[in-house]
Amino acid sequence: MKAILRSFAAACAVILTLAAASSSNADEFSSSQRSEVERIVREYLIAHPEVLQEAMNELDKRQTAAQAEKHKTAIKQYSDALFSSPRQVVLGNPNGNVTFVEFFDYNCGYCKRAMDDMLTLLKDDPKLKVVLKEFPVLGPGSVEAAQVAVAVHMQDKTGKKYLEFHQKLLTGRGEANKARALAVAKDIGLDMARLDKDMASPEVKATLQESFKLAEALGLNGTPSYVIGDNVVVGAVGLEALKEKVNTSRCGKPSC
C-alpha cells in the first residue's frame, strides 16, 4: 500500500510539473487551481490505475538506460586498469577479442556457484580473455584470503597455479581465511617462504586497492560482478546470460 501511495504521489508531482512547465503563467497557479489539477489527476488514476504501473515501468527503463551509460563512461575511463593492469590475473587468451572481467570474493556463495560458468567459457571460447579481480567485501576472512591469492599470483604469473589455488579455495568447505588459503597454497606446491615475503609487500595492498577503486567507479558493491566489453553484469546470472553478453560484445548480438 505504501508503495502504491508513493507511486501515486510521484505521478501527481510529475503531472503537476508538466502542467506548470507548459503554462506561460506557471508561477501564477493559485492554490485552488492546483487543488483542481490534483482532483483531476486523482480521479483519472482511480479510473485508470494501470497508468501507475506503466509509469513505473517507464521509469525503470530510463533508470536502467542511464545506469548503462554511466557504466560505459566508467569502463572507458578506467579501461587500462580494468583490462590491462599488470597486477591482474589473466586466464585464457591474453590477446582475445573479448575481455571478461570478474570481481569475486572467496566467501561468496554465488561466486562458488558461478565459477563453473567462468571455467566453461574459458574452455569453450579460445578467443576469450578472462581477468579475475580480488574484491573481498565479506569480512576479514575474505581480505586475508585475497591477500594470499595476490601473493600466489606474484609467484606464478602464468596463471596456472593461481587457477588451481582459486578453484580449491573457492570450492572448499568453511570460511575462506588466511589459514585455509595458506593450506591450499602449500597443498599445490608453492614456495611458502616466498609467499610469506610477498604477502608483506606493498604490491598486495596496491592490488586490492586498485580493485576497490574500480568497483567504486562502476558502482559495484557485491559479488560476483562482471565487466564484459562495455557492459556491467551484476550477480550470478548463469552461463547462457554470460555467453550472450560475450557474443554481444564480440559481434553485436546475443548469438554469433
What is the predicted role of each segment?
Residues 80-98:
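A short beta-strand-turn-helix
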Residues 105-106, 135-136, 231, 238:
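Solvent-exposed coil/turn segments that connect beta secondary-structure elements
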Residues 4-8, 26-42, 62, 183-256:
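C-terminal cap of thioredoxin/glutaredoxin-like
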Residues 36, 40, 47-54, 113, ...:
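Extracytoplasmic/secreted proteins, especially bacterial periplasmic and envelope-associated proteins
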Residues 101, 112-186, 196, 216-221, ...:
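Structural alpha/beta surface segment adjacent to cysteine/selenocysteine redox centers
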Residues 104-107, 222:
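Short pre-active-site segment immediately N-terminal to redox-active cysteine/selenocysteine motifs
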Residues 2-4, 13-80:
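N-terminal targeting signals for export/organelle localization
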Residues 108-112, 225-227:
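The canonical Cys-X-X-Cys-His
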